[in-house]
Amino acid sequence: MQIENLQLGNIYSNEEIRSTFGCSLQSGMNKSNSTNTLVLIINHIKSIYHDRWFNNKVHHIGKGQIGDQELTRENKTLSESKSNGVVPHLFEVFKTGEYIYRGQVHLYDKPYQKQQPDKNGDSRLVWVFPLKFNNNSRPINHSEIENVFKTQFKKSQKLSNEELESKANNLPDILGYREVATIRHQRNPYVVSYTLRR
């Protein structure tokens, strides 16, 4: 399959993406030198990152799970994508093994740094990339957002009070908003779970 044949909103497998772009999906940012692209994956099931959506814009967290993130490798590639000729493409995962193609994105503002917990729960600096779709991305299904919330809420029930309080305090109450049938705020499952225990 050619990159230009990808359809917005369609579901693709890991193998289809790998063969189309010429890169492996080892992380949330995957560079392909053969197609001069950067494949960005927002995995709502497994990721430790907390990307924030604002309709057709997303503030995407950079690569690096432990300690302060550095502006090197794929992070550098994305930060210089306005001038280096690399084209970023974004996929979302709501179910394991299913990658929904959202389209090409570009930086609409300068990357910035903020505090966010790492894989071990320690506070660290991450790079945030303000991205906007080159086209009008399709609204997502309401059920996809609800399924993610339910999955994260279920996981939050297994955390200790201390872990839950930490997660609730380290994230905003509202994680962003997405267009579904109407604009819907994404709730923070850790705040909800922590509030129910009080």
Model-derived features: where do they sit?
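Short, surface-exposed, polar/charged, turn-prone segments marking secondary-structure boundaries
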Residues: 60, 66-71, 117-119, 132-136, ...
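Phosphate-binding glycine-rich loops and adjacent basic patches that engage nucleotide phosphates
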Residues: 36-42, 151-160
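Compact mixed alphabeta submodule
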Residues: 94-154
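Short, charged surface segments at domain edges that flank catalytic/cofactor-binding sites
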Residues: 155-198
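A short, terminal or domain-edge coil/loop segment
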Residues: 6-9, 15-18, 143-155
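Charged, low-complexity, helix/coiled-coil-prone segments
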Residues: 2, 14-26, 135-142, 182-197
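Acidic, glycine-rich low-complexity segments with interspersed aromatic residues
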Residues: 2-99
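Conserved beta-strand residues within beta-sheet cores
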Residues: 87, 102-104, 192
